[in-house]
């Protein structure tokens, strides 16, 4: 019900709400609505992207996630802001880095070609200080390995090392998945 197309303009007005929680919810909703109705949220994309630089980590997290969902549906809508998203790969907040990976996975699902020269960014996240980020980082290699195995092949040695030696079981499992995807 909340994702209905006719609710998009109202949800867009909530981007400038009085509270962080309401603004965060509006960002999340616009991302979900944008996955289903990308053209209808297009007018809000510059406002969403402006939150990538917000001082509040929750709003950066939700903004990058929303751009990822919208970009999965129609990359051209978020293209002007795509490179801006990469600054969040080094964000001080782990949830922001995690959502950067998720957003990238969403976009790469339908538009993988754009990631070729950015793989080192994701390789750095394989050794992130936060376990949740490290657990998710191999997944972008899996997503891209299915679509563009040549992008992932230079990182197979590192992924193999993680799959055999990382302390975190999920990192090991996800690394194996990335390797299999690139070798299929």
Regions picked out by a protein language model, each given a short descriptive name:
Residues 20-21, 57-58, 94-95, 131-132, ...:
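Alpha-helix N-cap/helix-start positions at coil->helix boundaries
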Residues 156-184:
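Eukaryotic acidic, Ser/Thr-rich intrinsically disordered low-complexity regions
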């Amino acid at each position: 019900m909340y994702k209905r197309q006719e609710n998009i303009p109202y949800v867009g007005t909530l981007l400038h709400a009085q509270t962080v929680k309401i603004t965060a919810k509006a960002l999340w909703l616009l991302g979900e609505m944008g996955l289903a109705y990308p053209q209808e949220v297009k007018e809000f994309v510059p406002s969403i992207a402006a939150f990538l630089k917000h001082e509040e980590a929750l709003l950066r997290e939700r903004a990058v996630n929303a751009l990822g969902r919208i970009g999965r549906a129609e990359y051209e809508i978020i293209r002007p802001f795509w490179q801006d998203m990469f600054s969040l790969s080094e964000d001080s907040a782990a949830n922001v880095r995690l959502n950067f990976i998720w957003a990238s996975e969403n976009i790469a699902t339908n538009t993988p070609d754009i990631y070729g020269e950015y793989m080192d960014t994701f390789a750095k996240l394989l050794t992130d200080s936060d376990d949740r980020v490290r657990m998710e980082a191999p997944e972008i290699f899996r997503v891209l390995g299915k679509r563009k195995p040549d992008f992932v092949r230079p990182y197979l040695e590192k992924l193999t090392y993680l799959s055999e030696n990382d302390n975190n079981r999920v990192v090991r499992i996800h690394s194996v998945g990335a390797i299999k995807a690139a070798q299929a």
